[in-house]
Amino acid sequence: MKKFLIFLLAVLALTFVACGKDKDIESYLDMERINSEFNIEKQDKEQIKFTDKDESRSVYRIFNFQKMKNVDFKNPKKIDKLEEFYLGKNCEIIYKDESTIIVLVLAQDNSYAYNIQTFDDSKTELMMAVSIGSDKELSEDELFNLLDEAKSFLK
């Protein structure tokens, strides 16, 4: 059930993302680290999705990185649109600023599902998403640590 929920979260995380055009996505990421620590589920020139090798972890993570078109990335309302989308799905917004949104998607029977989405233009226009399934409620600090971990994959 947890794995299905996480897959669903990963699909939701990519709902508003469009592809960009220049270098391959892997040129912006620490692929050696990703290959050694995670299972790559999907990879092409525009996006990569990788998951924890240990599927029985108490906090299971799916990371998605996707290049965006400049016009979509520059949209000042992209976070507001994500917020509206999540609120329409009865999710709880934990944190939101101009480039990041952290959402509690599901809390049921000691299972928690979170989505973290952020946008980064330090190398190219990227959307980074972390979908998390956990058997315990995560603190805001723990969620920000997962956001920092996602950012640590950037070269």
What do the PLM-derived regions correspond to, one by one?
Residues 20-54, 85, 149-153:
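N-terminal "mature-domain start" segment
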Residues 130-155:
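Surface-exposed amphipathic alpha-helical segments
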Residues 15-18:
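C-terminal motif of bacterial Sec signal peptides marking the signal peptidase cleavage site
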Residues 31-36, 53-56, 66, 96-99, ...:
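Short, solvent-exposed coil/turn segments at beta-strand boundaries
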Residues 44-47, 56-59, 108-116:
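Short, surface-exposed coil-to-beta transition loops
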Residues 84-121:
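Signature of long, low-cysteine stretches enriched in small and polar/charged residues
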Residues 1-4:
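Positively charged n-region of N-terminal signal peptides that target proteins for export
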Residues 49-77, 127-133:
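A short acidic-to-branched-hydrophobic micro-motif
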